[in-house]
């Protein structure tokens, strides 16, 4: 078998660099978050950040249905006392004890009430506290990223090597 040419090596190197850069971006974005999820995607601007935008909606129906111009879909209406009008918050925000949460327009306080759509009253004592994660270098994540990049490079190398070997078996008739 032939040694891989400069084109195959260049392709493997570029693929490895792209994987390394992506892993570095995800590691930086996920720092302080519990695992890789919506928090990391918000920091990378892949997922719309709705927490600040929910507060701008002042009507319950607009809040729970979402505003198409702002791409909102995870807002709920929170009302703590009957005399207060309530406000729109993101579902992920901490809810005060004793507040009613409305997630359908039929259940909004100003709208007509349907007996099957009762608001959910939150009676939890304290919100869950995320695990403490000290900022800094995480050796296990670094080793995992290196193993991931090297394995992807090896797969790309062997796939290109296999395709190159298949092409070299064909001979012209003339």
Swiss-Prot record:
Transmembrane residue ranges: 142-162
Keyword tRNA processing: no
Extracellular topological domain residue ranges: 30-141
Entry-linked Pfam families: MGC-24
Annotated membrane topology: Single-pass type I membrane protein
Keyword Transmembrane part of the UniProt annotation: yes
PANTHER family: CD164 SIALOMUCIN-LIKE 2 PROTEIN, MUCIN/PORIMIN
Protein name: CD164 sialomucin-like 2 protein
Organism of provenance: Homo sapiens (Human)
